[in-house]
Amino acid sequence: MLLNKARAYEYMDRNGLDALVAQMSINVYYLSDYWGSLNWPGFFDGTYFAILPRREDAPASLVIPSFAIRRLASEGGTWMPNVFSYSTPEEGATLDDDTPAGLDYEGWPLRPGVPLTAREQSWVDITRRLRDQMSADAVWAVVRALRAAGLEGKRLGCDDERTGAWLAGRGFDARCEYRRDVFNQVRLVKTPREV
């Protein structure tokens, strides 16, 4: 794990934050151990997110686009227990939590009876697990992740100034603070895996 959790918790405590919300590629990678295929600085902003709650019993979450589901399996996954994904909005459809749904994601077509390698089977398995829980877009997936961690109405340290406006636009109540400094302070002390 790249993340120094103890240091992250220490800096959240020092700054009165209930969670860290990463959108910058390097911070998403640092928090989640997942590097997406579109995770390049300055490109495809708002494609991937990682949420690290301060409460240790609240689930951390990774948000990825539907086409990245198979890559998540190929790259060894993430230590984060929750993965929220998104696809194209499905007109008028909602998920169980009343947020707008995306179209179910089926992945690549699969011919019946064809033997699969272990890697191919892992792609099928993760697609089946996540396919019918697609959010309508990335921000709705972030809202779902934050709600799952009980972070509504809480103070969030964000590494992108736009995150608060994106969440407010979805009616999510939280105090979003631009706190790239906290991310930088946490990352100053390297974990053995980083070195």
Regions found by a protein language model. Name each.
Residues 1-195:
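A composition/biophysics-driven feature that prefers long, compositionally simple stretches
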